[in-house]
Amino acid sequence: MPSSISWGLLLLAALSCLGPGSLAQDAQETEASKQDQEHPASHRIAPHLAEFALSLYRVLARQSNTTNIFFSPVSIATALAMLSLGTKGDTHTQILEGLDFNLTEMAEADIHQGFQHLLQTLNRPNTQLQLTSGNGLFIHQNLKLLDKFLEDVKSLYHSEAFPTNFTNMEEARQQINSYVEKGTQGKIVELVKELDSDTVLALVNYIFFKGKWLKPFNEEHTREEDFHVDEATTVRVPMMNREGRFHLHHCSTLASWVLQMDYLGNATAIFLLPDEGKMQHLEDTVSTEILSKFLKNRQTTRVSLYFPKVSISGTYALKTVLSSLGITKVFSNAADLSGVTEEAPLIVSKALHKAVLDIDEEGTEAAGATVGGITFMSRPKEVIFDRPFLVVIYEHHTKSPLFVGKVVNPTQQ
């Protein structure tokens, strides 16, 4: 009976305030942009991450159209790519192809260099945006990993290695959960509920994101309003309101309103509100090319925007989801992880992923000053996010989708 890797994935998105506007370009960002132009490695993998994100989203959406969806394609892809360093044969090929990489078109070294640059960029200090990522290897104290695997995951993926006593399952579980809780500043606790008895290695990835909107909503304008979960279900939610000029337009191809909201710093959220009865059309039609055009070509419209406060999370056992994308061998007795250790055959027994999304008016660290809205002589057009919508959050410098989700019920954790 082979030993197993219990592989845990984690991320947090704490999106704490909402507001329109263009990004502030300070000296820090200008320098960051120069670095990215000199080292565009992460740009080369960005289109593949975007395709992987939509593929994964569609698998999750097919599983249920009545629940919230929220996950980080960057977090999941990073952990998979890191694991691929220790795989061989079909196990290796399935992982990289499942991430939308074609090894005849992109050298494997370029893929890992892209992730290396991505992680360096995400962890770059920023006074306006909190964005950090971490990778942890929890290794059975009696398990000897191959030196090359350890060197590669440390140099390319900035992974930390922790000796772990997996003979004491509760102690090991607490060690992993403490690492996760600290990395996400207490937002995600108890990621790992239990470990399999033959676990000898755990791979953990987390992303912590906390952003402030450039022009937050005025809390005084928030009112309890109806949100239509489906034709038969309505819930009351705190509905924020702001009048002004927004990066907003109606896309006839998607039959949806497209709203772009910039964070202070280097991230943007795209919200897609389908017309009545058009959610399935939106999910079937949206593509990476369309989303890329939205980011490049913005349209500004004067509206009165109504947007719900959101607090949702997504928790996923990824084995079934990844299998739908062709990543199967790594979870089977046919797995080849001989690049990790030569001591015993390994399989991945568990792949866990959790994400949390919070959106409100001011943000958890908003300054005391109140930013007023623009007042118009005549009432502008109203756009009301009072039914299910999609969200994609991008990091500008790497052009990568950090988070993807669907808000079906803003009050459902």
Curated annotation (Swiss-Prot):
Transmembrane segments: none
Subcellular location: Secreted
SMART domains: SERPIN
Signal sequence coordinates: 1-24
Site (Reactive bond): M377, S378
Keyword field: Glycoprotein, Protease inhibitor, Pyrrolidone carboxylic acid, Secreted, Serine protease inhibitor, Signal
Database matches in Pfam families: Serpin
Glycan-carrying positions: N65, N102, N165, N266
Cellular component terms per the entry's GO annotation: extracellular space
Gene3D superfamilies for this protein: Alpha-1-antitrypsin, domain 1 (2.30.39.10), Antithrombin, subunit I, domain 2 (3.30.497.10), Serpins superfamily (2.10.310.10)
Family matches, as SUPFAM superfamilies: Serpins
Reported tissue expression: Expressed in liver.
InterPro entries referenced in this protein's UniProt entry, alphabetically: Serpin_CS, Serpin_dom, Serpin_fam, Serpin_sf, Serpin_sf_1, Serpin_sf_2
Top-level taxon in the UniProt lineage: Eukaryota
GO molecular function: serine-type endopeptidase inhibitor activity
PANTHER family recorded: ALPHA-1-ANTITRYPSIN (PTHR11461:SF165), SERINE PROTEASE INHIBITOR, SERPIN (PTHR11461)
Similarity comment text for this entry: Belongs to the serpin family.
Domain comment as written in the entry: The reactive center loop (RCL) extends out from the body of the protein and directs binding to the target protease. The protease cleaves the serpin at the reactive site within the RCL, establishing a covalent linkage between the serpin reactive site and the active site of the protease. The resulting inactive serpin-protease complex is highly stable.
Function: Serine protease inhibitor.
Protein name listed in UniProt: Alpha-1-antitrypsin-like protein CM55-MS
Species this protein is from: Tamias sibiricus
Species lineage: Eukaryota, Metazoa, Chordata, Craniata, Vertebrata
